[in-house]
Amino acid sequence: MRSLHILFILVVVTWLGFPLRAQEAISIGTRHTLFSHVLNEAREYWVYVPATRPGEKEESYPVLYLLDGDSFFHSVVGFTRLFSTSKVSSLPPCIVVAVLNTNRTRDFTPTCSAARRDGTVRPGDKPEGGGAGQFCRFLTEELRLAVEQDLPVNGQHLLAGHSYAGLFTLHVLLNYPSAFDTYIAIDPSLWWDKGYFQKQVERQVDKVDFSGKQLYVAFATQPRLDRKLIHFPLTDDFIGSAVPRMEK
């Protein structure tokens, strides 16, 4: 048995010693850093640009601004490459700009709040958040400028976010509708600040011009108590009352 162990170790060491010619890095994007004067901090973002085949004329592309970029960059790039090349898909190729987080609660929430999902505030809970307006300025005034200077863009802008970032996406649509052309909100945190966004929708939705805008909303169905009691009712209200009024 000892001789077998020695043989196994020798094989592994020998294998590790060989140059593996097939081990070349596969790159799907580039890393960038931009200092934001709006946020007063450096922000990292990753960029994917569709490849141009040899002999093809370089094209210009829509830009998808992906929030929580460090979590979703690889999967979203994979989806865009798959569906933009599929014969049954009408999704055009697009540039993906994945924005990495430094403080997602601060950046993605429209108000400062200590309320939990169920609306309660317990002793010791501290208010946080409320920086969505500033973060929107960073995206549209600073990051977009850097992207458009360096990349082959066609002037179409998409914004996609999940959870807190989904709430941010809806917040931008309601308050700054001209900022983007297409909004994709995945399972947005409508419970934030005791359902603040839904109340804001009721006050503002009829005063906002959504013409030419596209909104895609998806909600998870994970069986969790707070989803049944809090998340789903807010979702039903949003889809039932707000979305039809946005379509007018």
Language model regions located:
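Positively charged n-region of N-terminal signal peptides that target proteins for export
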Residues: 1-6
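Bacterial N-terminal signal peptides
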Residues: 7-17
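Sec/Tat signal peptide C-region and signal peptidase I cleavage site
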Residues: 18-22
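Non-catalytic cap/lid and distal C-terminal segments of serine-dependent acyl enzymes
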Residues: 23-248
